[in-house]
A protein has these predicted regions:
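Nucleotide-activated donor-binding/catalytic signature segment of Leloir-type glycosyltransferases, i.e.
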Residues: 289-313
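Conserved acidic donor-binding segment of nucleotide-sugar-dependent glycosyltransferases
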Residues: 363, 368-375, 384-390
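Glycosyltransferase donor-sugar binding loop
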Residues: 274-290, 305-308
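A short, well-ordered alpha-helix in the C-terminal region of glycosyltransferases
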Residues: 377, 384, 391-405, 412-418
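Conserved donor-binding/catalytic core segment of Leloir-type glycosyltransferases
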Residues: 236-254, 260-263, 276
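Short hydrophobic beta-strand element within catalytic cores of glycosyltransferases
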Residues: 348-351
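Carbohydrate-associated surface elements
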Residues: 202, 224
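A conserved catalytic-core segment of Leloir-type glycosyltransferases
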Residues: 37-125
Length: 432
């Protein structure tokens, strides 16, 4: 069986969707499946072995120029191809390419326009490449890539599925009139996919309604993590000082400001508690971090932001320094890979009771759920975990064991193959 996975690069940042797509490709390869992981826009940035092996399609620089200058798409390809070089794109993404939805409305619309828009040539190149690969199944990593679908289906006759991993968050961040235009086109074009996958029941139901599609077209793909590098173990006793941790993108929707409010309440009861935070910080969110740092001023040296570690081992060492982990998101999280990372190192979690979190907690029992938007409830739960040694160790042990038994790479590969078999798109059932 040969599966082609088309994944969108994260413009130089560690992106949860990219990381899970990369993990997915590795899990399938380990199970004996042939996999082609195809990057779009930019090279992916991951903290494990990169599973991509193809050129970058829809290179971010050329895509930007095609969107800005109508004549750029008529420039001979041999004159523009060098701009799709991964090294060139990496150099530019360090300083120029934005992933802020507020700035990408026009480009989002033009990408969804597909064969009718300025990126028609790029779509044809991707379609030709995939058709030449002759995979049994194609999987796109988000619905915003649907502009290529009709061009692809002119030459490739196998099934094309889509993994939804937070598409609504980006779309809802678009400014008008681009959001309305993008949504209208997306609802129509998304229907061309043969099936959809989500990582939670919540997101399945939400996106079926959001895209106006029958829920019967949706299947669940479990989240998974390679636990081998994660050597943290559940602690017998709480650290001194007790440490609350956060590791996710630094942005308003992830809720670090909410965690600071809760920790300030915890500090009234546990005077030596500290808060350690880490994660990618985009330029547009530096002022947000400034506000968070100002709000955390009463904590003094007990608040620390470590930045975004360049190496996985640095992140693991950070996680191992924690006693409890929390990312109190404002939005409803569709995945939650950072939860798996905490569990893999023996850290219990406290999370808002919305999005994918209840299903994740149910799968292992490795944490507590609290009322969303309540710093008081969050503070009470954090204090409970830090002061009840039996509870803390029990939650840590359940999460540590649960991720290894239920969210491992072998289960991800088995679930993928079973999913395609159940939809009639297993090996040997299609021709391309």
């Amino acid at each position: 069986m040969h599966i082609a996975i088309v994944t969108a690069g994260g413009a130089g940042m560690f992106c949860g969707s990219c990381i899970h797509d990369n993990t997915w490709a590795r899990a399938l390869r380990d199970a004996g499946v042939e996999v082609s992981l195809i990057p779009l826009y930019t090279p992916i940035r991951v903290d494990e072995a990169d599973q991509t092996s193809s050129p970058v399609f829809f290179g971010g620089i050329n895509t930007f120029l095609e969107d800005r200058f109508s004549w750029w798409g008529r420039v001979p390809r041999f004159l523009t191809r060098w701009l799709d070089s991964p090294s060139i794109i990496r150099m530019v993404t360090q300083r120029a390419i934005s992933t802020d939805a507020r700035e990408l409305g026009a480009m989002t619309v033009s990408m969804i326009e597909g064969e009718h828009g300025p990126h028609r040539r790029a779509g044809e190149e991707l379609a030709q490449y995939i058709t030449h690969l002759k995979p049994d199944i194609v999987c796109f990593s988000n619905a915003l890539l649907c502009g290529t679908l009709r061009t692809l289906k002119q030459t490739y006759f196998g099934p094309v599925h889509c993994v939804l991993q937070g598409d609504d968050i980006f779309l809802d961040g678009l400014v008008e009139p681009y959001r309305s235009r993008a949504m209208a086109m997306l609802s129509q074009r998304a229907a061309d996919f043969d099936g959809f996958m989500t990582h939670s029941h919540y997101y399945r139901d939400y996106m079926a309604a959001y895209l106006k599609l029958p829920v019967e077209k949706f299947r669940q793909l479990p989240l998974a993590l390679d636990c081998a590098p994660h050597d943290g173990q559940p602690r017998d006793v709480c650290g001194d000082p007790p440490t609350i941790g956060y590791f996710a993108r630094i942005c308003p929707e992830k809720g670090l400001d909410r965690l600071v409010k809760a920790v300030l309440l915890v500090r009234e009861r546990i005077p030596n508690v500290r808060l350690r935070a880490g994660g990618y910080l985009a330029a547009q969110h530096r002022s947000y971090l400034d506000d968070v740092t100002h709000a955390a001023a009463p904590l003094g040296d007990a608040f620390e932001y470590i930045g975004s570690p360049a190496e996985k081992q640095e992140k693991i060492e950070f996680l191992k320094s924690l006693d409890v982990f929390s990312v109190p998101t404002v939005y409803r999280e569709p995945k939650g890979i950072y939860v798996l990372e905490a569990w893999s190192n023996g850290i219990p979690v406290v999370l808002p009771s919305h999005g994918a979190f209840p299903q994740l907690i149910e799968s292992t029992g490795g944490g507590l759920l609290v009322a969303p938007e309540s710093p008081e409830d969050l503070a009470d739960a954090l204090e409970k975990v830090l002061t009840d040694e039996v509870l803390r160790k029990n939650l840590a042990q359940l999460g540590h064991e649960g991720i290894r038994s239920k969210h491992n790479l072998q289960n991800l590969a088995r679930a993928t193959l079973a999913l395609f078999d159940s939809t009639g798109t297993g090996p040997g059932t299609i021709m391309s």
